[in-house]
Amino acid sequence: MTEQNLHWLSATEMAASVASNNLSPNEIAEAMIQRVDAVNPSINAIVQFDREQVTRDAAELSRQQEAGEKLGPLHGVPFTIKDLTAVDGLPTTFGMKPMADNIATGNAVVVDRLRGAGGLFLGKTNTPESGYYGGTDNHLYGPTHNPWKLGNSAGGSSGGASAAVAAGLGPLAEGSDGAGSVRIPSALCGVVGLKPTTGVIPQTILAGRFYNWAYHGPITRTVADNALMLDIMAGPDNADPLSIERAETSYVEASKGDVKGLRVAWSPNLGLGHVDPEVLAVCLDALAAFEELGAQITEATPQWGNPSESMWSGIWVPGFASEYDLLDWENQRGEVDDYLIEIMHEAERLTGVDVGRADAFRGDMWDTWTTFMNDYDVLVSPTLASATFPLRQFAPSWLEGASLREQLLDWLFTYPYNMLNNPAITVPAGFTADGRPVGLQIAARHRRDALVLRTAANFEAVRPWADKKPADSLVVA
């Protein structure tokens, strides 16, 4: 095994090699530092990186290995943390210049759990300001490029995390998802991203502890690694009053087994609007995999209307405004994005009646969803209406000139599942003719996270993607 290919090992492979003493955390760290130095300047995925600290941490993990101490399930495996999540002693900037000196005084629960499992913290990844849209650019660190097509969007808001995984900057990345922020960039970067059921992973991103729409999620290159990372991060914690007990069976074990007879509903757009014909064609081709696996496929779409207005006025706008209302927004022009300031002013125009109506719509949507899923086990769709598009473009070109809400939401097939709190995963479905990744989304009912992972793992078995990597000529300057 050489340093030249260590960075493409899965987390599962790395952990097994460390456990069998065929690989040391020191070797992993050296390979990863070289990879970050070579690739990150081109894509700007990791924005806080301390190579000396990585080396020191790896040395301690190697000492434990050499001493024959009990090793954790991620011993020596690199992971990154999104810059919305607290890491003790490092800035939690939210991608905002006014927060550049906001030094965390403790770790988020997920950071403690990943480190406690022996994981090697590699650095913090880029995010748009406050994680507010489906791309990754900000006034503090600049844009993150898609490793498959430089100059194009990596998606967001976990764009740095997804780009890092896609480019071989560690097999595991923590993301967070409030309207698709794990699944959007994972789809655009050709990796696996899971939004679990609300409460499976305790959230400490939002000050509002009873918010139930934004949660941490694992981003990986393989489904097995996704299940492994979820096993580490899952479980209740007093920091999150909505967190729930762990499943009795590990997600790694529960994701095994076939899907013969699985009732699959296929929807080309979830009833939400236009889909790029090439994206739809890639997803339709991928859908044939479920027939090969013995699943039963029916084209069907939940009749829940258009939930984007309720997502906007009932969740997104008031949620962001309440999280960041201490900043003096008008005096931050030029320091933060003008569109984010517009969202804050939009919140000032909302009334309690607006928010209440949106919440009522969400309840009706839940009823529609649960009734619909009485006939199906999973609902499969494109993850997004488009493959990646140029940086600094909010949305696909067909939404140019549309309202801010439409540009932010109307190309996403992800946010309904934040409103419903159920699990949804995106997996690589294939590529457009010019080599841009396309994602396929698999969703299931509340607390059926293991089923989502098992379905994704079976799909991966017949449509493998781990050997498909962006060319170094694209990502190395």
UniProtKB/Swiss-Prot annotation:
Listed Gene3D superfamilies: Amidase signature (AS) domain
GO molecular function: amidase activity; aminoacylase activity; aryl-acylamidase activity
Role description: Amidase with broad substrate specificity, catalyzing the hydrolysis of a wide range of N-substituted amides, and, to a lesser extent, the hydrolysis of non-substituted amides. Acid para-nitroanilides (4'-nitroacetanilide, Gly-pNA, Ala-pNA, Leu-pNA) are the best substrates for this enzyme.
Catalytic-site annotation from UniProt: 82 (charge relay system), 157 (charge relay system), 181 (acyl-ester intermediate)
Catalytic activity: a monocarboxylic acid amide + H2O = a monocarboxylate + NH4(+); an anilide + H2O = aniline + a carboxylate + H(+); an N-acyl-L-amino acid + H2O = an L-alpha-amino acid + a carboxylate; an N-acetyl-L-cysteine-S-conjugate + H2O = an S-substituted L-cysteine + acetate
Enzyme Commission number(s) of this protein: 3.5.1.13, 3.5.1.14, 3.5.1.4
pH-dependence of activity, as noted: Optimum pH is 7-8. At low pH values the enzyme is rapidly inactivated, whereas in basic medium inactivation is rather slow.
Pfam families tied to this protein: Amidase (PF01425)
Keywords assigned: Hydrolase
GO terms of biological process kind: amide catabolic process
Keyword Hydrolase attached: yes
Influence of temperature on activity: Optimum temperature is 55 degrees Celsius. Shows a drastic decrease in activity above the optimal temperature. Is stable for 15 hours at 22 degrees Celsius and for 0.5 hour at 45 degrees Celsius.
UniProt KW S-adenosyl-L-methionine keyword: no
Underlying gene: aam
Entry similarity comment: Belongs to the amidase family.
Species annotation: Rhodococcus erythropolis
UniProt-listed InterPro entries: Amidase, Amidase_CS, Amidase_dom, AS_sf
Protein's UniProt name: Acylamidase
